[in-house]
A protein has these predicted regions:
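Long, contiguous juxta-domain segments that are non-catalytic but functionally important
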Residues: 226-252, 260-262, 267, 273-384, ...
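Conserved His + Asp/Glu catalytic blocks
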Residues: 398, 405-422, 429, 433, ...
């Protein structure tokens, strides 16, 4: 484990002078010409190098006029406006759902008169009655004017489409205030109180970070239905921005990305469809920008969702082209033809769709394939020994703080804001840390022969991982279901002895009879015990006691978290307080086939 902690504490961000990427795992070496290059650029024999400025892959610095614009101000000066459903999660992070509406679908033209009217900005505010949310939509007239003036003088795409300034619209903007013409809806009050048992735990606490790959309706229909479901009268009209008459192909139109996000591409350089000698795939293009030196792409509240969704649909298009090349006879099928095929071919057609859709990460077909991989592992390796869950202490880890806010890593507010602003780096760190932990603990300490993991994101945006591990010489739990009583009893004893070797449910600060539980040390939350670097740990047992007190005790039940009403009585859904138990037991009942309960002499310890 010492190697694990040393690996994390040694992480530092390095920068490549050629591609201008900066990232913790970037391996940079000094070249004979005196510049520092990552291994990819050093081995790149292309002329010019694929990710260099000479190949139009450097968007350049952001001028002062564009540096401090709010999201609303940027949308007012954007000649292209991708429409996406973004919402704020608890504790400040953002999420999105559905598709980013890119121009081949519904939007048909570049804006040639800017700034946009406030009523044309694609923001739909959903708020509770009397809740003040317009503070998020600050607009400064002078800042908008200066930014637009700079773009007209310096952005090649703004000049090429002949954008002009609408002085009347500009004059209608507040000098420094909030937009008041934004479309707003208020959710209808619920007719009846929803009990906690009526809430889907999976949807409430965790959601996968992937969009639905095939929405059943158009984006316009989906948004209109959503507005109506929030209590709007059926006759309400959803006003949409004015559009032109020439469709725009998002994957081929030069300048599309630059005009959608002018603060990220100030001069128009490095646009995906811009001219370059050596082509770059859409996935590598977005990865490059998310690692760009100043971090502006990773920190932009909308661009990361735009990138994820665009890449996913790009891959879907490529998969569709491969399918058509391999099945040329189906190239001109209509929707009715497809319905007939589904009816006639049934499972055969479904298998075809699953096969081609499995390469699209996050789709049902993808997870169906992963499920089959897991089943194949179980068929080969037997039942897994351990099911584990690890959550991110992303506001506490000192190693992450040093990476994500190196200027002030000890400032709690700075750490929280940095995680909100740059979730991509925080998520990468969690993935990297888990991989190193699995290698150090499950493989090298427990000698696991194999493992399987799935990453998920909690409702507030922080990640966690569920996994399975196979350990050598583990008892065969299937023998507990044997018809032989002797085999069942011997297997019980074998499992109990094995579990007691690898599992500890003891709180060092509490006596076996639990009599001194009130004297146990309190949680260390200011500073949090997880803020403590491993290099500062001088007493392992004391540190373990503090970790248990802070992270492994269920000290508070509440209706918003764990209390559920069953049979007229409130109960903790995690079963706290636990019953005291002097030894590890295995119970086999009809309701719960096999339950192993470890020894318990601390009523609120996580066991």
């Amino acid at each position: 484990m010492l190697k694990f902690h040393e690996c994390l504490s040694s992480l530092t961000s390095a920068k490549c002078d050629t591609c201008l990427e900066r990232f913790p795992t970037l391996s940079v070496t000094s070249q004979p010409n005196g510049i520092n290059e990552c291994s990819r650029c050093a081995h790149d024999k292309s002329i010019p190098k694929r990710y260099s400025s000479a190949n139009n892959m450097d968007p350049g610095p952001v001028p002062l006029q564009l540096q401090s614009l709010s999201q609303t101000e940027e949308m007012l000066i954007s000649a292209v406006m991708p429409v996406m459903s973004i919402y704020r999660l608890p504790h400040g992070q953002y999420g999105y759902s559905g598709h980013v509406i890119n121009f081949p679908q519904d939007v048909h033209g570049f804006a040639t008169t800017l700034p946009r009217l406030p009523s044309e900005v694609d923001i739909l505010v959903v708020r509770k009655e009397k809740e003040q949310t317009h503070r998020d939509f600050r607009v400064r007239r002078r800042a908008v004017e200066e930014a637009l003036t700079w773009l007209l003088a310096n952005n090649i795409y703004y000049r090429s489409i002949g954008v002009s300034v609408d002085q009347n619209t500009l004059a209608s903007l507040p000098e420094d205030g909030d937009l008041t013409d934004l479309r707003t809806v208020q959710p209808a009050e619920s007719q009846g109180e929803v009990t906690p048992d009526d809430v889907s735990t999976e949807e409430h606490y965790s959601s996968s970070f992937v969009p639905n790959a095939a929405p059943p309706a158009t984006e316009r229909e989906t948004i209109e239905q959503a507005v109506q479901s929030l209590g709007q009268p059926q006759s309400s009209h959803l006003m949409w921005p004015s559009i032109g008459g020439t469709p725009i192909n998002e994957f081929q139109t030069e300048g599309y990305f630059s005009m959608a996000f002018p603060t990220l591409f100030p001069t128009g350089a490095a646009d995906f469809n811009g001219i370059r000698m050596n082509s770059v795939t859409v996935g590598n293009y977005f990865t490059h920008l998310m690692k760009y030196d100043d971090g502006r792409f990773a920190k932009h509240p909308r661009f990361r969702f735009f990138a994820l969704n665009t890449e996913m649909r790009w891959r879907a298009n490529e998969t569709g082209r491969i399918y058509i090349r391999q099945h040329p006879g189906e190239a001109h099928l209509t929707v009715d033809d497809l319905r007939d095929m589904i009816g006639r071919e049934g499972e055969s057609f479904s298998n075809k769709v699953v096969h081609y859709g499995a390469s699209l990460r996050g789709t049902r077909q993808y997870w169906f394939r992963e499920r089959n991989h897991l089943i194949a592992m179980i068929d080969t390796l037997g039942l897994p020994t351990i099911f584990f869950t690890h959550s991110a202490a992303d506001h506490q880890w000192p190693e992450l703080a040093s990476l994500i806010c190196p200027e002030d890593p000890d400032n709690k507010q700075a750490r929280v804001k940095a995680v909100i602003d740059n979730p991509a780096l925080a998520d990468w760190f969690f993935y990297y840390r888990i991989q190193k932990f699995v290698d150090a603990f499950y493989i090298h300490t427990l000698k696991a022969t194999d493992y399987w993991m799935r990453f998920e994101w909690q409702h507030r945006g922080s990640p966690h991982v569920h996994g399975l591990a196979w350990l050598p010489n583990a008892p065969n739990v299937e023998d507990l279901l044997s018809s032989s009583p002797d085999l069942v009893e011997s297997t019980k004893q074998e499992i109990i002895e094995y579990a007691d070797k690898i599992i500890s449910t003891i709180n060092p600060a509490v006596l076996p009879d639990g009599s001194n539980v009130s004297d146990a040390p309190p949680p260390k939350v200011d500073p949090h015990i997880c803020n403590k670097p491993y290099s500062e740990v001088t007493d392992l047992e004391e540190d373990l006691t503090d970790l248990i007190a802070t992270c492994q005790r269920h000290t508070r039940c509440s209706e918003s978290y764990c209390l559920r009403t069953r049979n007229g009585k409130q109960e903790c859904r995690f079963g706290y307080p636990k019953d005291l138990q002097a030894q590890t037991n295995i119970n086999i009942t009809e309701e719960e086939p096999v339950i192993l309960t470890a020894l318990v002499y601390e009523l609120f310890l996580n066991v």
